[in-house]
Amino acid sequence: MSKKSNKNLAFSLLGLIISMVLLSFASVPIYNLFCKVTGYGGTTAKETVSVYSKVKGTKPIIIEFDANVDKDLPWRFIPRQQRVQIVPGQNTLVFYETENLSDNDIIGTSVYNVTPNKAGKYFVKIHCFCFEEQLLKAGERVLMPVTFYIDKDFELDPEMQDIKVLTLSYSFFKVREMSSLRGNYVSN
């Protein structure tokens, strides 16, 4: 092989590596955009401006609430209400209660899902605590609000006619903990 061939091969491999790294960083935002647009996997819509729906539907829907905690996170996490009955377009405020059961300050973060998945695109969150780091001091208990509504178009979609119950499920995961004695962050 000539020096020119080796140089071309090296540049090609370097370009391939750089492209793969860039694609790996771009894949999460691209996937999130895909899920928002299509409602894939129960991804909900998120209201970017606090504009409340003025038009209300007529078909009652039951919203059930679920809470899960990763085994590595010593928190108690429960919905304050097990379920509510609403109509599309009705703004609703519910709370989840979270308590740090450990002797250390801990930062956690949550993800959510709406089931059945096909209805996720009609579940509009106005405010929630998901995807934001939450610091709970040792023994601290907090209420975390979620404000949402079901888009009025839910009633018009023939695929939603059989749905009477939606479930909003949150799962909390440990990000890191801060040792009470040393004040240092301990990574998960």
Swiss-Prot record:
Main subcellular location: membrane
Topology of this chain in the membrane: Single-pass type II membrane protein
Cytoplasmic-side positions: 1-8
Alphabetized InterPro entries for the sequence: CtaG/Cox11_dom_sf, Cyt_c_oxidase_assmbl_CtaG
Keyword Transferase found: no
HAMAP family reported for this sequence: CtaG
Alphabetized PANTHER family for the sequence: CYTOCHROME C OXIDASE ASSEMBLY PROTEIN COX11, MITOCHONDRIAL-RELATED (PTHR21320:SF3), CYTOCHROME C OXIDASE ASSEMBLY PROTEIN COX11-RELATED (PTHR21320)
Protein name (database record): Cytochrome c oxidase assembly protein CtaG
Native organism taxonomy: Bacteria, Pseudomonadati, Pseudomonadota, Alphaproteobacteria, Rickettsiales
